[in-house]
Amino acid sequence: MAVARGKYLCFVDSDDYVAPTYLEELYNAITQNDADIACCYYYYHFVNSDVLYKYPFRCEGVYSRGEALNKLLHDTQIQSLVWNKIYRRSIFTENNITFPSMAFEDMATANRIFANAEKVVVINKALYYYNQQNTSTLATINAAKINDFIRATAMVRINLESAGVYNDYQKAYHALSRKTCLCCFYYVVKMHYRKKSMKGVLTNMKRVARAIRHYAGDDFTHTQVFRELPDVVDTPEDLRGNTV
């Protein structure tokens, strides 16, 4: 982003691909609606079987900042994915928005981007192809990545509080927290299963639930930065001494 000079930014993961009209349709949507962000939908491409599955939860239209941020936090019709969107570059430069060095960095950052967008347009077309491979973040899930997922959820709370709008989106944030908790339960079980050790799996799940409750609670100190947010989940190797 530091070397970008154009009016708009768009991101594509190196192992994914896009439809031939991907940029054209996003550009037309953002310019014709005088929007700050334009979003499209995507296909899951399961590489090994060469099967395409279109993401099912969709919407279409032009949304105000509040409407779009609320949808983003619910993480269904609009998701915290950096790569199926085009952005007005000034949102980043004028608000000093960068991506932290962590897994799930888009989740930690998307809320800041949307909080500074006056208008968001969504087109109900799947123009991006998200390759599901054995080397992706979720396919290679481990304790460090699960901890970053939880940390990213806390960073969303910190960002909303810092912007003075948390109370406006508290219900949506709680929905995001519940979804994160359920996803992390699944990732914890998957991690233990891949390591062929279920010892400590309940300990890790309890830690996840406790951390998510804390980050969504009234006593959470939102002045923390992400480097100060502690790890929650341990590797199965580190938990072998625990009793399930």
Task: Indicate where each model-derived feature is located.
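Short, conserved alpha-helix that lines the donor NDP-sugar binding/gating region
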Residues: 1-2
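Short aromatic/hydrophobic "clamp" motif used to bind/position activated sugar donors
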Residues: 9
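Donor-binding/catalytic cores of nucleotide-activated saccharide
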Residues: 14-121, 131-141
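Membrane-interface aromatic/basic loop that binds lipid-linked glycans or pyrophosphate carriers
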Residues: 35, 191-244
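Catalytic core of nucleotide-sugar-dependent glycosyltransferases
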Residues: 127-133, 140-165, 187-191, 195-216
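Short, charged, amphipathic alpha-helical segments
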Residues: 169-176, 202-203
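Amphipathic alpha-helical repeat scaffolds of TPR domains
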Residues: 174-187
